[in-house]
């Protein structure tokens, strides 16, 4: 087995379901880790056949990549909620960059299975996700790739479920939005699609809220919010002014919440902290009717005290 910067690989790194990286497991000081190798950028060697000018340009690009990733990971490390998978190490070895996290075991539970749970168990899972999202949003982090594959679900001893949020590779600091913001079209927000052709479109953490609205609908019903057959994706319908149909399988307060999360205007989507408060109060009291609410400067169909932070 190979060794990378003191991490002993358990086997060959693989590209399976990995996108632009390789991954695998490793150990260091008897502790098990997950390791990811970035396929790009590749740090050039001074002995390469490239011209010195090209080598220096590529080295600067790599150094900027390292600085930006390091800043992002350091910010993420402040969000140790227990439900975010924190980056434990980030380094360059030879020409490649590597990222290390704890090894986390997942039970491979898809949204359809979650939809069969009792309401209190579904609400508990959603609360655990919102708790983590609120933490990294308030630290200025945007995940930008919220979807079931990036939620490692695990059943607890009392048969409830918790989620660890993984794969922040598409993530960025809200203060430093990259030129190229993408995502899975199934969970893409309207403004991310618009940004692909218009760089002036503002991108914020509310792209995660839109994706969570779709994900929570799946967790509750096992299906996506309904749109007419002319649309392939939820964001397409929303851009055309069509409100996705939220299943009546969801309680009224959940239905209202998801509808707000799927608003065209990002400013009309509640913050993760507001949503967490909703689930902690309405969910715990088993109320189905939502009174009026104000979240900072925005008004929604449920109540949050004005001194709530």
Which positions does each model-derived feature cover?
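Activation segment signature within eukaryotic-like protein kinase domains
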Residues: 125-126
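Conserved C-terminal C-lobe helix
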Residues: 249-264
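Short beta-strand micro-motifs within the conserved protein kinase catalytic domain, predominantly
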Residues: 86-97
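ATP-binding glycine-rich loop module of kinase domains
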Residues: 22-70, 74
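Catalytic-loop of the protein kinase fold
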Residues: 136-154
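Regulatory extensions appended to serine/threonine kinase catalytic cores
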Residues: 285-309
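A conserved short helix/loop substructure at the end of the activation segment
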Residues: 262-274
């Amino acid at each position: 087995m190979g060794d990378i910067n003191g991490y002993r690989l358990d086997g060959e790194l693989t590209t399976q379901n990995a996108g632009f990286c390789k991954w695998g497991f490793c150990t260091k000081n008897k502790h098990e880790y997950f390791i990811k190798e970035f396929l790009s950028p590749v740090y050039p060697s001074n002995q390469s056949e490239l011209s010195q000018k090209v080598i220096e340009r590529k080295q600067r690009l790599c150094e900027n990549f390292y600085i930006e990733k390091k800043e992002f990971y350091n910010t993420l490390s402040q969000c140790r909620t227990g439900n975010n998978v924190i980056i434990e190490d980030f380094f360059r070895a030879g020409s490649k960059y590597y990222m290390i996290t704890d090894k986390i075991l997942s039970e491979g539970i898809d949204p359809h299975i979650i939809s069969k749970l009792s309401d209190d168990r579904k609400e508990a899972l959603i609360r655990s996700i919102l708790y983590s999202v609120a933490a990294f949003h308030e630290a200025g982090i945007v995940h930008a790739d919220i979807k079931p594959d990036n939620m490692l679900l695990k059943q607890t001893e009392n048969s409830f479920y918790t989620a660890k949020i993984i794969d922040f590779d598409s993530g960025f600091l809200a203060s430093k939005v990259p030129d190229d913001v993408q995502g899975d079209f199934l969970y893409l927000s309207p403004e991310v699609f618009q940004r692909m052709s218009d760089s002036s479109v503002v991108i914020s953490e509310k792209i995660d809220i839109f994706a969570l609205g779709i994900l929570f609908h799946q967790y509750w019903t096992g299906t996506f919010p309904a749109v007419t057959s002319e649309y392939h994706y939820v964001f397409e319908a929303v851009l055309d002014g069509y409100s996705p149909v939220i299943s009546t399988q969801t309680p009224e307060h959940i239905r209202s919440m998801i509808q707000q999360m799927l608003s065209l205007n990002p400013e009309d989507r509640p913050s993760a902290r507001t949503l967490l408060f909703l689930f902690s109060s309405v969910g715990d009291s088993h109320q189905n009717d939502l009174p009026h609410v104000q979240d900072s400067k925005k008004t929604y169909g449920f109540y949050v005290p004005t001194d709530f932070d």
